[in-house]
C-alpha cells in the first residue's frame, strides 16, 4: 500500500505502517512510505 507520508529513511515508515495497517512492514520509496500487508 502506498501512503502520502514523507520519509527519508525506511525506519521512519515502520511506526506509520504499524498505525495505518497494523503491521510495521514497509520501506521508504521515492520519498514516501510504502507499506506491505
From Swiss-Prot:
- From what organism does this protein derive? Mesobuthus eupeus
Q: Anything further noted? A: Negative results: does not inhibit Kv1.4/KCNA4, Kv1.5/KCNA5, Kv2.1/KCNB1, Kv3.1/KCNC1, Kv4.2/KCND2, Kv11.1/KCNH2, Nav1.1/SCN1A, Nav1.2/SCN2A, Nav1.4/SCN4A, Nav1.5/SCN5A, B.germanica Nav1, and Cav3.3/CACNA1I (when 1 uM is tested).
Q: Which cysteines are joined by disulfide bonds?
A: 7-28, 13-33, 17-35
User: Which residues are tagged with the site Aromatic residue of the functional dyad?
Assistant: 36
Marked site, Basic residue of the functional dyad, at: 27
Its function, per the record, reads: Inhibits voltage-gated potassium channel rKv1.1/KCNA1 (IC(50)=130-135 nM), rKv1.2/KCNA2 (IC(50)=3.1 nM), hKv1.3/KCNA3 (IC(50)=78 nM), and rKv1.6/KCNA6 (IC(50)=910 nM). Its activity (tested on Kv1.2) is not voltage-dependent.
| Source organism phylogeny | Eukaryota, Metazoa, Ecdysozoa, Arthropoda, Chelicerata
> What family does the database annotate?
Belongs to the short scorpion toxin superfamily. Potassium channel inhibitor family. Alpha-KTx 01 subfamily.
Domains (record comment): Has the structural arrangement of an alpha-helix connected to antiparallel beta-sheets by disulfide bonds (CS-alpha/beta).
Kindly list the positions at which Pyrrolidone carboxylic acid occurs in this protein. Answer: 1
Compartment(s) where it occurs, according to its Swiss-Prot or TrEMBL record: Secreted
Record InterPro entries: Scorpion_toxin-like_sf, Scorpion_toxinS_K_inh
UniProt keyword annotations, A-Z: Disulfide bond, Ion channel impairing toxin, Potassium channel impairing toxin, Pyrrolidone carboxylic acid, Secreted, Toxin, Voltage-gated potassium channel impairing toxin
Tissue distribution of the protein: Expressed by the venom gland.
> Which GO CC terms are listed, alphabetically?
extracellular region
**Which Gene Ontology terms cover its molecular function?**
ion channel inhibitor activity; potassium channel regulator activity; toxin activity
Origin: domain of life? Eukaryota
Question: What protein name does the entry list?
Answer: Potassium channel toxin alpha-KTx 1.17
